Amino acid sequence: DGVRLTVLHPGEAPPAGEPVLLRGSASNARTCVLRIATDHGVAALLAGDIERAQEQALVRSGAPLAADVLVVPHHGSKTSSSDAFLDAVQPALALVQSGYRNRFGHPAAPVVQRYRDRGITLVASPACGAASWSSQDGQLRCERERSKRYWHHRVVGDGAEGDEGQ
């Protein structure tokens, strides 16, 4: 079908004695990182909840990280989206999955700035709603825009492109 799915993280199996199900922040370290690529050279990277340590390990491993679209690691937390990782992925578009005015402050302002410094279009789910992206035309479609009649309030200050409040 012309699509390749590659699991980049976690590796084969946890080391002997390490539990498969981890709690707390350690469970973020075991999240799935998936690269989806087409035969036409278009790719998306779904980074799950990895943090800086896992990003660095992926960069050092030489894994195929380059992607047109990146689902931002760990909802854009301050422990993710390191310079080295963003330089390896080099996405044109990054999607942040975060709740509107969430208690964690995701995406974190320094993370948003790292994307902006690289000219990466950053779109957050509070502003976009459900996002769909096509590898054929490279277009992002926001459900919030397509179904405006269902949305009764403006989203402000969520750290994404098109913020009304910035």
Stretches found by the model and what they are:
Residues 1-69, 127-166:
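Core dinuclear metal-dependent hydrolase active-site scaffold
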Residues 55-132:
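Cap/insert and terminal regions of metallo-dependent hydrolase folds
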